[in-house]
């Protein structure tokens, strides 16, 4: 199963277009798709079925890209994956709203996880989300600090990448 094709199959042709076009633009930009690939590989290691892990794998990628939209706004980044960032191509409000919608869409995708696995998946997903937010806050905090230790920096990176 090609995770990139599965991501591109997600339907973003909805109204209001100003909310969903930036999501489609973001996900169509590609990327390594490391998180969903790792989810698929881990599942296969334990004889899991691709169709059972696919909703969680897709949710991971949508969530990851949501964090990138918000990170680009916070960092005032102009480019991402060789293309203008959403807040540059559209505007900051659109980037924030589209990012927020991606978060919601990630949870909607998780609803496709088999019922017996869903509580644990949600627990892990929420832990990941919390760690990413904590790491991002450290990143913001470090911008105003004179010095950051290597240990602090590594902690920030570990949390941001969860």
Where are the regions that the model predicts?
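Conserved N-terminal diphosphate/IPP-binding helix and adjacent helical/loop segment
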Residues: 1-63, 69, 73-88, 127, ...
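All-alpha helical catalytic cores of prenyl diphosphate-utilizing isoprenoid enzymes
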Residues: 13, 28-32, 97, 113-162
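Short alpha-helical transmembrane interface motifs in multi-pass membrane proteins
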Residues: 24, 91-92, 154
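Catalytic-loop motifs flanking and including active-site residues across diverse enzymes
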Residues: 34-35, 58, 95-102, 160-161
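Residue-level signal for inorganic ion chemistry
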Residues: 38, 106, 135
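Short glycine/serine- and small hydrophobic-enriched flexible loop segments
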Residues: 40-44, 107-112
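Short alpha-helical functional segments enriched in proximate histidine and acidic residues
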Residues: 65, 109, 131
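Multi-pass membrane catalytic core of lipid/isoprenoid biosynthesis enzymes
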Residues: 88-108
């Amino acid at each position: 199963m090609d995770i990139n094709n599965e991501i591109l199959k997600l339907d973003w042709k909805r109204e209001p277009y100003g909310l969903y076009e930036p999501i489609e633009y973001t996900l169509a930009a590609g990327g390594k798709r490391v998180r969903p690939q790792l989810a698929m590989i881990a599942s296969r290691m334990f004889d899991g079925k691709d169709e059972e892990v696919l909703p969680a794998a897709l949710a991971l990628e949508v969530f990851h890209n949501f964090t990138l939209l918000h990170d680009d706004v916070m960092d005032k980044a102009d480019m991402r994956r060789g293309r203008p960032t959403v807040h540059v191509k559209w505007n900051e409000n659109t980037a924030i709203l589209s990012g927020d919608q991606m978060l919601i869409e990630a949870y909607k995708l998780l609803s496709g996880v088999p019922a017996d696995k869903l509580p644990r998946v949600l627990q892990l997903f929420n832990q990941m989300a919390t760690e990413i937010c904590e790491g991002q806050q450290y990143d913001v905090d470090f911008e105003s600090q004179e010095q950051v230790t290597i240990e602090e920096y590594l902690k920030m990176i570990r949390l941001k990448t969860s």
